[in-house]
């Protein structure tokens, strides 16, 4: 009985590591063998970045959850692998009660890109 061929797994040409810190966001990009690395950043210098994640649906979009010193929590989005960033139009927020009261978001500690079947918007 012949064995089925092993599936081929694509080896990435580069590896990207997003490092979120209390001082900003750094990006390390390395070759597939992880022997050579380039450091870029910081992005959002002086702001606390709680989480950063690349969207696997396109490989270019990055989301970053940050807490700016005076404006509070926000989410930034890059569609060019971190070369430029756009801040969300509205900060993260809980739904308000009918009387206008409600809880306040202190920080966003985790972001999850949409499912592979969902459109990017």
Regions from the PLM with identified roles:
Residues 1-121:
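Extracellular glycan-interacting surfaces
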